[in-house]
């Protein structure tokens, strides 16, 4: 467990993820989602003097934590970028095709969820923001204030998998014409009233809030870009471990890995004039999808939706 600004964060699948990277003492590794540094600290504890670790994060608070770690350990460097940009960062450091392992721990962290001022939570009132980097892009409030009802409904449905997306979007637009949304609790209440069928044990605003967060931070687009960049950055034999927390993320990871296991030309007719190498696998899967243990679920209920997939680069 790491503690930041009074908010507890328990790293999910900590030992399993680091073990999946098959660390070499002198290897070069990337933590694409530094967060509060749980995975990074464990990786560093297993690297030798020649080992290196490069961390990425968009969140200013995560960067501050990372800079403190970098000051303590010269083997570690933190950069304030999305892991979707790791290709450019790796190229600039002459590490393309030389990275031994990459870890991506997707989604929002507990400190982000639990800090009302970040605007991620429908349980604790705060400014309606939701940006991983509050200094970049438009906030959730700005999106809600200007987007057409069809676009809001699309975000709720496509990214939040909300059954009543249209109805909830119309309620949002109707209310914003009278008074703009600036607070999370205000939006959550309107969504709650507009949702006609509450799921047992789940806040009726959950899916819509997820959709907003994913849209505001371009999470799925970043994931698709980041996976491609990660594969290019890895050396042959390098490992990629990805932890996802909802079906949309996991579907992207699963399809990406499946495509590369079968060969990139898997969907092409076999009589097309393409090189045989195009059909050869680029990765192999390491084991099956992993989930949190019973012990971890008891210690950290938020780990219940975590799933980790691991692949090794073949060429």
Swiss-Prot record:
Catalyzed reactions per annotation: cytidine(1402) in 16S rRNA + S-adenosyl-L-methionine = N(4)-methylcytidine(1402) in 16S rRNA + S-adenosyl-L-homocysteine + H(+)
GO molecular function terms attached to this record: rRNA (cytosine-N4-)-methyltransferase activity
InterPro entries from the UniProt entry: RsmH, SAM-dep_MeTrfase_MraW_recog, SAM-dependent_MTases_sf
Leader sequence segment: none
Entry keyword set: Cytoplasm, Methyltransferase, rRNA processing, S-adenosyl-L-methionine, Transferase
Enzyme Commission numbers on file: 2.1.1.199
Single biological process term from Gene Ontology: rRNA base methylation
Pfam families in the cross-refs: Methyltransf_5 (PF01795)
Binding site for S-adenosyl-L-methionine: 37-39, 57, 83, 105, 112
One Gene Ontology cellular component annotation held by this UniProt entry: cytoplasm
Family matches, as SUPFAM superfamilies: Putative methyltransferase TM0872, insert domain (SSF81799), S-adenosyl-L-methionine-dependent methyltransferases (SSF53335)
Subcellular location field: Cytoplasm
Family: Belongs to the methyltransferase superfamily. RsmH family.
Function: Specifically methylates the N4 position of cytidine in position 1402 (C1402) of 16S rRNA.
NCBIfam families linked: 16S rRNA (cytosine(1402)-N(4))-methyltransferase RsmH (TIGR00006)
Protein name (Swiss-Prot/TrEMBL): Ribosomal RNA small subunit methyltransferase H
Organism of provenance: Pseudomonas entomophila (strain L48)
Chain's gene name: rsmH
